[in-house]
Amino acid sequence: MLYWALVFLVVAIIAGALGFGGIAGTSAGIAQILFFIFLAFLVISLLAGLFRRA
């Protein structure tokens, strides 16, 4: 699950860079939402991995 969270975070960062840079101005809001959703998934996955090992 951590692997997929990292993959989706990278995709969201790329989409965010395109959206925030003005290349795809209409999708900037969607890119922002996806970025923060997948960032939250990354944090949750990291915490779950830490608690699972402890």
Curated annotation (Swiss-Prot):
Main localization of the protein described in the UniProt heading: membrane
Q: What superkingdom heads the lineage?
A: Bacteria
List the membrane topology term(s): Multi-pass membrane protein
- Transmembrane domains' residue ranges: 4-24, 30-50
Its localization reads: Cell membrane
UniProt keyword terms in alphabetical order: Cell membrane, Membrane, Transmembrane, Transmembrane helix
Q: Which GO terms describe its cellular component?
A: plasma membrane
Family according to the record: Belongs to the UPF0391 family.
Protein's recorded name? UPF0391 membrane protein msr3702
Q: Which organism is it from?
A: Mesorhizobium japonicum (strain LMG 29417 / CECT 9101 / MAFF 303099)
